[in-house]
Amino acid sequence: GVYGATRRFPEEIMQELAIIRSKVGKKVFGVDLVLPPGMPEFNSRDEIEAEIPDAHKRFVEDLKKKYNVPDASEPGMRTRFIRSKEIEEQQLHAVLESDVDMLACGIGAPPEVVAEAKRRGKLTLALIGSPHHVVKALSAGVDVIVAQGYDAGAHTGPIGTYSLVPQ
C-alpha cells in the first residue's frame, strides 16, 4: 500500500512510518507526497494570506454570515500549514531517511528527488493525469507510472482513467 502523507508534518511522517513498519514487518509499502512546482519558499501563513484579495475575503465572510457558518474550532486538513518548499524539503527528508520502500510523487516528480530516492534504494512512482505528464515523469527517471483520471477522487485533470490509460 501507499500512505498519503502530503498533509502531515515531517515529525508525524516519521512517527507514522514507524507505526506502519511495525505492523507490516518486511512487507513493501510506500509514501505519496504531492510535490507541485511554484510553491512559496517558506511556510509563512501571514505572507500568503496577505496576498488574498479583499474581495475574496469579503465573499467568504458574506457566505459565512448568510449561511450561519461558525469559525473553525480546530485546524483542518487545509489549514494546518501552507504548502512551501520549506515543508516539502522537510517531508522529503523524513521519507528519504526512513526505511519505506517506495516514494510516489503527485503533481510533479522532480528529477533530483527521483534520483535521490533511487540512490537510497527506493522504488519511485509518479501519479499522472494526462499523457504529457507521462513524458515528464519518464524523463525524470521514475520506475512506475500510475495513471489516474479525474475519477480518482480529488485528482486534477479533465481526463477519466478509462480514457487516460490507452493514451
List PLM regions with ranges.
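Active-site entrance/lid segments in N-terminal catalytic domains of soluble metabolic enzymes
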Residues: G1-Q167
